[in-house]
């Protein structure tokens, strides 16, 4: 991939998860060099410019002698690399390297080209500085985590390479790379940015997009296992409140349910007036998550194309301006909203699991076991689901409403965006498990059906049964859950269901008007 002005989520994932190599475009090199020229001119003069020839934070009024400018940048990195906690996952660090290089390549930071090239060299070699997960307050950007990232460039700290954590200097030498000797402004440019929260958001957003599609599939499977009505998902119903997300979710539900033999079998005579909200209101609940994901993708697209440094260099005029582009609030607020939206996918999924396991609601054997009492079936699977849903409620508390002033009150409002982003990552992981539990239960519920489900649901059900057998007697089925969860996370289960829809003949017509009226009267 050629790194220039444009970077999208698909490209980000291709690099961070699939190892696509990255190089700077010629235009990016030129932009970087022009901004560097401005810094070199400043160094030759005596005008105090923040972060170039002054101290940092509360020390902004301390002017630094020209002979100490390189030491100033070195000191900045080593003093700020004070993060704690478990190391960030490899994919998160890859994302930080890519996004920092992307921001610097826009040509408003004043670094030399070789600094950006070293970032990309580490990324392409998958030689990843060890970055602790805790220590960012989200303004000025992700200072401590990015300082740990920068340590690797100057040959300090540790780098994980080929499965081993080793001193950075040793890994650089093995790769034939030289540690960079930071010059004026370069240390500050490396650590002033939102790349930790940006990387975490990008990864979580991608996973949440897959998660939403799978949540729609799980809901459709539960609707079929529970003899639920399809009528609330029809365009005339959802179209009366046409939020984009609700329309999109309803359309996908109709695709998964098309061709069902189950729905026509219970249009009348089952005694139900309407389904529970967790079945009937899936377009509205999942649709709200769809809308939140769409907004997050818009915010992320802007962030990918942004310069989050301070001060900013304007090569056309030679101006150097202190601004607030480093502040993480645009991301933090978006992430907090996404936390709630994704957590709700788990909350409603757990309620659908209850609809499957409770015989008073489902008409199916209690806990989906044919021999209850001796066997407990899926009873405790719901406990796990409930525990994770409850945990998500705590994690969903907004981090961006909190702020603790830092740097002697010079930096008096911060975003806590990285904290929110780490919470979002955990929420996504928890919901992946909650939905896997629903899918296990829904597949078991379909085992009691004699008719075929909608094409997408049926394909997913049959695929699940290739690696998870029907539960006839109690067994240790955590491995089954883990395997199914893996298929969910990879997106393979969703692809199977979607492929069945695209390869199928045109969906069958809805029942004749008389049947449709009966369905509306008895089930809506």
From Swiss-Prot:
Keywords, alphabetical: Cytoplasm, Histidine metabolism, Lyase
GO cellular component: cytoplasm
Pfam families the UniProt entry points to: Lyase_aromatic
EC number(s) from the headed UniProt entry: 4.3.1.3
Pathway: Amino-acid degradation; L-histidine degradation into L-glutamate; N-formimidoyl-L-glutamate from L-histidine: step 1/3
Compartments it resides in: Cytoplasm
PTM note: Contains an active site 4-methylidene-imidazol-5-one (MIO), which is formed autocatalytically by cyclization and dehydration of residues Ala-Ser-Gly.
Per UniProt, location of the 5-imidazolinone (Ala-Gly) cross-link in this chain: 139-141
Source organism, top-level taxon: Bacteria
Sites of 2,3-didehydroalanine (Ser) modification: 140
Segments for region (Disordered): 500-524
GO MF, one example: histidine ammonia-lyase activity
GO annotation (BP), single: L-histidine catabolic process to glutamate and formate
Reaction it catalyzes: L-histidine = trans-urocanate + NH4(+)
Family the UniProt entry places it in: Belongs to the PAL/histidase family.
PANTHER family linked to this entry: HISTIDINE AMMONIA-LYASE
Protein name (database record): Histidine ammonia-lyase
Species of the source: Deinococcus radiodurans (strain ATCC 13939 / DSM 20539 / JCM 16871 / CCUG 27074 / LMG 4051 / NBRC 15346 / NCIMB 9279 / VKM B-1422 / R1)
């Amino acid at each position: 991939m050629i790194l220039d002005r444009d970077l999208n989520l698909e490209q980000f994932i291709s690099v961070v998860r699939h190892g696509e190599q990255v190089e700077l475009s010629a235009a990016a090199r030129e932009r970087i060099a022009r901004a560097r020229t401005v810094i070199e001119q400043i160094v030759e003069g005596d005008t105090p410019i923040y972060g170039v020839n002054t101290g940092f934070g509360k020390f902004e009024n301390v002017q630094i002698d020209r002979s100490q400018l390189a030491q100033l940048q070195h000191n900045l990195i080593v003093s700020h690399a004070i993060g704690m906690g478990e190391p960030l996952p490899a994919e998160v660090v890859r994302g930080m390297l890519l996004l920092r290089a992307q921001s610097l390549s826009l040509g408003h930071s004043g670094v030399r080209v070789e600094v950006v090239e070293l970032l990309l060299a580490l990324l392409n070699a998958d030689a990843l500085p060890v970055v602790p997960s805790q220590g960012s307050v989200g303004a000025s950007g992700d200072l401590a985590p990015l300082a740990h990232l920068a340590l690797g460039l100057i040959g300090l700290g540790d780098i994980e390479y080929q499965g081993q954590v080793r001193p950075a200097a040793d890994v650089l030498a093995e790769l034939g790379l030289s540690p960079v000797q930071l010059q004026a402004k370069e240390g500050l440019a490396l650590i002033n940015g939102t790349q930790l929260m940006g990387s975490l958001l990008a990864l979580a957003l991608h996973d949440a997009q897959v998660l939403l599609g799978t949540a729609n599939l799980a809901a459709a499977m539960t609707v079929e296992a529970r003899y639920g009505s399809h009528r609330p998902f029809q365009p005339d119903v959802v179209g009366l409140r046409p939020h984009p997300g609700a329309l999109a979710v309803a359309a996908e539900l109709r695709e998964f349910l098309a061709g069902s033999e189950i729905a026509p079998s219970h249009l009348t005579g089952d005694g139900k007036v309407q389904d529970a909200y967790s079945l009937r209101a899936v377009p509205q609940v999942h649709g709200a998550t769809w809308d939140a994901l769409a907004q997050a993708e818009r915010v992320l697209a802007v962030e990918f194309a942004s310069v989050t440094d301070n001060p900013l260099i304007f090569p056309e005029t030679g101006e150097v301006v202190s601004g607030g582009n480093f502040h993480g609030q645009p991301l933090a607020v978006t992430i907090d909203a996404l936390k709630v939206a994704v957590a709700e996918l788990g909350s409603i999924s757990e309620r659908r699991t209850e609809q499957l396991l409770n015989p008073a609601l489902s008409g199916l054997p209690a806990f989906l076991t044919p021999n209850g009492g001796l066997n407990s079936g899926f009873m405790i699977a719901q406990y796990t689901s409930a525990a994770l849903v409850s945990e998500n409620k705590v994690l969903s508390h907004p981090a961006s409403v909190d702020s603790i002033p830092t740097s002697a009150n010079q930096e008096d409002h911060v975003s806590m965006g990285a904290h929110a982003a780490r919470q979002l990552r955990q929420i996504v992981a928890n919901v992946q498990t909650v939905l896997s539990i629903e899918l296990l239960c829904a597949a078991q519920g379909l085992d009691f059906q004699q008719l075929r489900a909608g094409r997408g649901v049926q394909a997913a059900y049959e695929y699940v049964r290739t690696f998870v057998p029907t539960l006839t007697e109690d067994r240790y089925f955590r491995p089954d859950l883990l395997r199914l969860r893996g298929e969910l996370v990879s997106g393979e289960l969703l692809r199977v269901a979607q492929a069945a829809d695209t390869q199928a003949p045109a969906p069958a017509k809805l029942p004749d008007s008389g049947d449709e009226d009966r369905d509306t009267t008895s089930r809506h």
